[in-house]
Amino acid sequence: MNPITLDEKTILGAISLEKIGELIKPLRIFYKDKDFYTPDLLNGHAEIPAGVRITFETNSPIMMVEFASSQNEVEFDVVIDHERIKTVIVQPGDTSFTIDGLSNNHKKVEIYLSQQQQVLLKNVFVDENAKWEVHKSTRKKWLTYGSSITQCHAAESPSQTWPAITANELDLDLICLGYSGQCQYEPMVARTIRDTPVDFISLSAGINIYGGDCYNHRTFQAIIIGFIKIIREKQPRVPIVLSSPIYGTFREDTPNLVGLTLIKMREQVKEIVEIFRKNGDESIFYVNGLDILSAEHENLLPDGLHPDADGYKLMGRKFAAAFKPYFKKDNVFSY
């Protein structure tokens, strides 16, 4: 069969790629600085390829994907010309899967990697008589940062996370920095966003900080302001949307160990945007998380915090509508 070159041109949505022998590990941090992303690559979540997809064009009727075996089930989505045609569930120990019966027409192929498990890629093959080429995207790039609610462990499949749905609806190329339990607004992540040229940025603020009792009334706004200031060092005019937490059941009015509630955090997140705009930053905007999922959607939060698969689909549609006024495609920003 005919191998596809796996590199930064065909593996999209990763921040960097780590070569391990004959394997490639997509990372959602800069590999060269990996020791600085403490603890242990954001507790391992930077190694999980949420939003990462192998992307190319081909006329092949068959494809084979090879990877390192896992101790767990691993899901992949196969998307042809922006339509999901199959979710492949790979069993523990398996090292490949094949998709056949495709048309001989020229098509865009996207193979979404798992948003739940680490994936080490080995090869992708098309038919030996088929042609393939790098997909030259004209889409704008969008980077989103958040928690497990952005990583979307409970999504129906890898291409059904809310960021993937939003990106598809708005015709954007996605970079997803959703790190389960790790959205603490540390400077290394701010530097990562600063040093990744994109057209649009969205930041979700609050729920991991509430759950981790990380910052109090004195430090909550200060850490997020500093985070955005770092991004602005190299991306001064790129639109940034800062969103506050979605509905969080008892967390709404129950203070955490440092005295914050989600109600108070939303007020402070909104105020952060007002501070930036008052000081001349007209490219930063606020989205209230309750406009995405509110108390009326509590049935979509089975554990009172994380959305289920239907909840993530709704979030994808709602965020697309919320971001659309700010992510204007005719805007061109220099990095």
Name what the model sees in each region:
Residues 235-240:
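A short helix->loop->beta-strand "cap" motif at the edges of active sites that frequently abuts
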Residues 250-287, 314, 333:
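Substrate-gating cap/lid alpha-helix
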Residues 1-141, 324-335:
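N-terminal secretory targeting modules
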Residues 102, 111-197:
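Serine-esterase "nucleophile elbow" of acetyl-processing enzymes
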Residues 166, 185-225, 230, 245-252:
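Oxyanion-hole/transition-state-stabilizing segment in secreted/luminal serine hydrolases
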Residues 302-335:
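Histidine-centered active-site loop/cap adjacent to the catalytic His
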Residues 215-223, 257-265, 303, 307:
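Alpha-helix N-cap and loop-to-helix initiation/capping positions
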Residues 65, 145-146, 243:
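Short hydrophobic segments within beta-strands
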